[in-house]
Amino acid sequence: MQPAYPDPARTLLRGGLVADGIGEVTQRADVLVDGPVIAGVIARGDPPAECAVIDLAPGSVICPGFIDAHVHAEGPLLAAGRVDGALAQGVTTLVVGQDGQSWIGAMAATARYLNEYFAPVNGALEPARDLSVAAFRGAVSGRLAQNVAVLASQGTIRHNVAGLDRGPLDPGQRAAARREVEQALADGAVGLSSGLDYLPSRFGGVAETAAVAAPLAAAGRPYVSHLRAYGPQVAAGLAELAAVGAGAGARVHASHLWGAPADLRAAFEAAAAAGVDLSYDMYPYRRSSTVLAMLLLPPELQARGPAATLAALADPRQRARLLAGE
């Protein structure tokens, strides 16, 4: 999805230092933008006819917009059509629908669950309702200030067909989930994400997830995963990712990857030897943020939803068992 462009769409950015991402040397030049297209990098001089002119502050750099390959921005995009903090950093493309937990693609019951479970990350969908990929695209059409790509979400789709059921999807549920992936791709989704630390995404095993992700192969789209394991266990997490890719016949991508370099290299070499196209993104700092329950509570305690989890934690006996590591 592309942003809406102002009238006049032809704009000259004048007085900057151009870093085009191709050459090693910057150059002093002006940049002519025509809607979504860079129409030219031109020598300093009088502006072309019929274009707006923006005079840049001394020392300004003109460069291609940055891509945030992993962002939770559904809420501000639906509400305002933009993410101001990202724009201020030069981010012009956002990839949402991450970690298998987006209310884009949700049925109303799933949206209500995500409003309780994941709203601190994605924002809430109010009122909770069915919101397909096509419906989201329609809701933001003509209002965007940034390019937006949407991933379908495996956990969302799993909740649509099975709620918080911990067991494997039965054949009918698998077929229903696969149809949802096919429809999301037809509606413009650019891949399928999962979040194997989150519920109910983590309840899907390799065979199930590969079957649900199978439509990606024909569409040429990737399977993008928040792994089940990072750090000391990252090799196992990447092996599972590669197994899903092999089963689905799709390219795979590891979200916010971290671990020991030797472990990462071995896992990537193993994936390549198995014929799996594996890529990754990584953030440049040592801290992250997520849902506290993911880190501290066993999955079985969360399996009936946030309200039931809070009720269980109110029981002194349950708290004692947790503190004892039982």
Label the model's feature ranges.
Residues 1-48:
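N-terminal metal-binding scaffold of metallo-dependent hydrolase/deaminase domains
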Residues 81-87, 91, 208-212, 240, ...:
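A short acidic, amphipathic alpha-helical/loop segment
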Residues 105-126, 134-137, 144, 155-169, ...:
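Polyanionic/metal-chelating signatures
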Residues 75-78, 201-204, 229-234, 258-264:
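Acidic-and-aromatic substrate-binding clefts and catalytic sites of carbohydrate-active enzymes
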Residues 67-71, 94-96, 148-152, 192-194, ...:
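Hydrophobic faces of well-ordered beta-strands that scaffold small-molecule active sites
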Residues 16, 31, 36, 59, ...:
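Divalent metal-coordination and catalytic microenvironments
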Residues 99-106, 114, 120-227, 231-240, ...:
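Hydrophobic, small-residue-rich alpha-helical packing segments that form membrane-like cores
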